[in-house]
Amino acid sequence: MAKESMKAREVKRAKLVAKFATKRAELKATISNVNSSDEERWDAVLKLQQLPRDSARTRQQNRCRITGRPHGFLRKFGLSRIKLREAAMRGEVPGLKKASW
């Protein structure tokens, strides 16, 4: 189980990403726009640097909904491999069954 503080930190990051997503996208569009002047681009770079670090999407880490485990995470289910296996063995995941060949 991950510490509660780690789970809370990820929730905080998710809120920051949502809050600054449009502003970050606008600044990145200005920076990558070929028709923008060098001064506009430079201003956009400086403004982008002023945004909080945790507002970047890449700072977020996928975590298991149950345990908060960051590794072995399966996006399709939102669970770690361990908790997914436990749920599948109990028959709680529709359409998922143990492989045998």
UniProtKB/Swiss-Prot annotation:
One of its GO terms (cellular component) is cytoplasm. Pfam families: Ribosomal_S14. One of its GO terms (biological process) is translation. It comes from the Bacteria. Keywords: Ribonucleoprotein, Ribosomal protein, RNA-binding, rRNA-binding. Part of the 30S ribosomal subunit. Contacts proteins S3 and S10. NCBIfam families: PRK08881.1 (NF006477). This is Small ribosomal subunit protein uS14. It comes from Pseudoalteromonas atlantica (strain T6c / ATCC BAA-1087).
